[in-house]
Structures are given as C-alpha cells and as structure tokens.
Amino acid sequence: FVSKIKGVFDDERKQLKKLDKIAQEIISLEDKYSALSDEELANQTNVLKEKLNSGSELDDILVDAFAVAREAAWRQIHLKAFKVQLMGGIALHNGDIAEMKTGEGKTLTSIFPVYLNALTGKGVHVITVNDYLAERDARNNGKVLEFLGLTVGLNKRELTPQQKQEAHGCDVTYTTNAELGFDYLRDNMVTSMEDKVLVKGLNYALIDEVDSILIDESRTPLIISGGKKNTAALYLQADRFVKSLKADEDYEVDIESKTVALTAQGITKAEKGFKISNLYDPQHTSLVHHI
C-alpha cells in the first residue's frame, strides 16, 4: 500500500517536472516575440494555423502558441504570465484538472489552452458557473484573443436562436454550464439541421470551477418540459420551506461564484418537509428548481 502511494507522488513529481521544462521553453521565447510589432505578433496566429494545415499537431506548436499568447496578454491586459500559470495552462490543454489558489491567476491561465485549441477552427467553449463570470472573462480575455485575430462570442439565455448560432460559431465561446446544456438538449429536439445552434458541435471545453460544475451542479438535472399547472402552489411551498432554513447549517452560499446549495442537513429537511425519499430523484426536478 505504501509503495502504491509513493508511486502516485513519484508520478506527480515527474509530471510537474515535465510541465516545468515546457514552461521554461515558453519563457525563453519572450525576447523573440516581444521584438515583434503588434501587427507581426497578431499575424503569428496565421503562421501557427498554417503549421497545423501542413500536418503539425497542437502539441507541436504549443510552445510557440503559448509564447505568442503570453506576449499578447502583456500588451493587451498588462498581465505577464509566470511559470506556474504556464504550467497550469499546459495541464489544462492535456485534459487534466489544474488546482490553483485564489490570486494565482486562473483567468490568465485559461487564455493559453483556449488560444491553442481555437487555432484548429473547430471551436472552443469556456464554461463558467454563472453569467457574471462568463461576461467578465469574455470581456477581459476577449481583448487578448481578438487582438490575435480570433472571434469571441458570449452565449446568454436571452439570445435568439440566430444570435446563439453566431455566438457558438465563434472561435471561442463563453457560456454557463446550464445554458450550454440546454442548447445541447434543444439541438437534439430540432427537426432541421439549420435550426441547431451548436453550429460547430462540441470540440474542446475548458471548465472553470470544475468541481462545482461536474459535482455540485450535476445534482440538478437539465430537463426541458412544458411545466405543470400547479407551479404557483409549488412556488409557495418552496418559499415557506426556504424561509425555515438556517444559513451555513441548511445551505451554503459561495459569494465568489454567486451560487447557493443545500447541505446534507438541508437536503434531509427538504425530504422530510415534502415527504419524499430522494430530493434528487428525476421526478422531483421541478421541486429542486423551485427551491
């Protein structure tokens, strides 16, 4: 057992060492790209795309792509990525989860794998937990990506189908997990391919607050239905129930991500209050949404 645990840590050290080496290569190109004019730097996107068209893989152009994005971020939003942020970006490109503390530059880190994967032209989705974060990141990181010649879209609930097609048709699309999920469900209900909003399909996604989205948020199913006639009564019942809850004991509020979730104690209270055995049974989805 001890040897297995030791092996896990050894593998992690090897992985970090590999990421460190690649990050150093990226930093070593700083002088090369800082010497370019804005026009020459932006044109590197075309240079990198041509390499992909000539048969190169994304991993082959990673170092140059990250170095280009690093210089562009410095010029456009005055943030210089350090080694730890580059390492995080490489890990995200590899499909791994990168855990970073508050203040370590998670938003800046996301630019690098997003830019690299957008070079394929197949589309990239950046998924966040709420509209505020999606709009903020689209606005701030969008300055860097648009400077480099990429198109950036923001997917919101109030958009028309045509506007959603335009947003999803961009090189990079910022969206919430719920809105992307509903777009996917609606696309599977259309009778004509022309009505689909995910015009590029799903290629590469970068998920912010991945633990919240893939674990916490996944407890609430995304269901499209016609709704029930007793929805008003359910609102009143849910309202009375919520007023009986105690903060921190029955529910927790995450100020940073602007989300609220029932605790285990709160879930038990709900099941007793509404006389059900499992709050997160699909048949109680409407109740969960009302709460």
Question: Where are the language model's segments positioned?
Answer:
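Conserved P-loop NTPase motor core
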Residues: F1-I291
